[in-house]
């Protein structure tokens, strides 16, 4: 039976999961839930199923793989990564992996909070002002390595790609001062399975957020 990935019909938190499923050549199907238009943003497609799937903590995204039913995007990523040996191996790598995973989630949520805020236009300059400092830390961490933990790709590279690339969509010039981050994105997109997925009809780079967002809702 194929894996089932459930999420809104957007990029959102599922982007790195979809990329990891594709990279690992996993057999999966998507259950994409539609959200209604303003002002109600009807979520009944999801709410009608929310408590019928046997999820311990019902939420989107969810992944069902046989008897394994998982919510929380990073828990889903770690589950797939463990199956395919895409986690850090040494204690140092595991520590770096944990730090990166959480740091990336913090920065992902920073952008999301801004883009859902009614005062988006007022707050945007402050976000852009802090963006170079944020990206500089990732650039320093990556250094001359091909991947964030070294020579081996791991699941945190999939999160990093998503976070860095969506910031590039938000502010196209933001990576210009960080050639190693631009190279990282090119390297990731050049992976055979990823490149094929990006050319397929399954690829969903937009909308970044739901219809409730001020930016990234289309």
From Swiss-Prot:
Name the positions where substrate binds.
Answer: 116
How would you classify this enzyme at the top EC level? transferase
List, alphabetically, the InterPro entries matched. Answer: Glutathione-S-Trfase_C-like, Glutathione-S-Trfase_C_sf, Glutathione_S-Trfase, Glutathione_S-Trfase_N, GST_C, GST_mu, GST_superfamily, Thioredoxin-like_sf
Binding-site list for glutathione = 7-8, 43-46, 50, 59-60, 72-73
Q: What is its EC number?
A: 2.5.1.18
Q: Which GO terms describe its molecular function?
A: glutathione transferase activity; identical protein binding
What SUPFAM superfamilies does its record include?
Answer: GST C-terminal domain-like, Thioredoxin-like
The chemistry this enzyme catalyses reads: RX + glutathione = an S-substituted glutathione + a halide anion + H(+); 11(S)-hydroxy-14(S),15(S)-epoxy-(5Z,8Z,12E)-eicosatrienoate + glutathione = (11S,15S)-dihydroxy-14(R)-S-glutathionyl-(5Z,8Z,12E)-eicosatrienoate
Chief subcellular location: cytoplasm
Which residue ranges does the record assign to the GST C-terminal domain? 90-208
* Residues annotated with Phosphoserine modification: 27, 44
GST N-terminal domain: residues covered:
2-88
Name a biological process GO annotation. Answer: glutathione metabolic process
Q: Which residues form a coiled coil?
A: none
Q: What does this protein do?
A: Conjugation of reduced glutathione to a wide number of exogenous and endogenous hydrophobic electrophiles. Participates in the formation of novel hepoxilin regioisomers.
Subunit and interaction comment: Homodimer.
Q: Which family does it belong to?
A: Belongs to the GST superfamily. Mu family.
| The protein, known as | Glutathione S-transferase Mu 2
């Amino acid at each position: 039976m194929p894996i089932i990935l459930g999420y809104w019909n957007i990029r959102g938190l599922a982007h790195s999961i979809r990329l990891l499923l594709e990279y690992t050549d996993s057999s999966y199907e998507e259950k994409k839930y539609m959200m209604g238009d303003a002002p109600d943003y009807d979520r009944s497609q999801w709410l009608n199923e929310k408590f019928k799937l046997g999820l311990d903590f019902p939420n989107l995204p969810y992944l069902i793989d046989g008897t394994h039913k998982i919510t929380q995007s990073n828990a889903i990523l770690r589950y797939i990564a463990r199956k395919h040996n895409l986690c850090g191996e040494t204690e140092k790598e595991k520590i770096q992996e944990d730090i990166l995973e959480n740091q990336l989630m913090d920065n992902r949520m920073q952008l999301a909070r801004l883009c859902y805020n009614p005062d988006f236009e007022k707050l945007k300059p402050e976000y852009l002002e802090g963006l170079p400092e944020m990206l500089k830390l990732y650039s320093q961490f990556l250094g001359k390595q091909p991947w964030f933990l070294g020579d081996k790709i791991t699941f945190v590279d999939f999160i990093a790609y998503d976070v860095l690339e969506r910031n590039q969509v938000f502010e196209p010039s933001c990576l210009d001062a960080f050639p190693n981050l631009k190279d990282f994105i090119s390297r990731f997109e050049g992976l055979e399975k990823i490149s094929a997925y990006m050319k397929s009809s399954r690829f969903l780079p937009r909308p970044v957020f739901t219809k409730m967002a001020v930016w990234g809702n289309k």
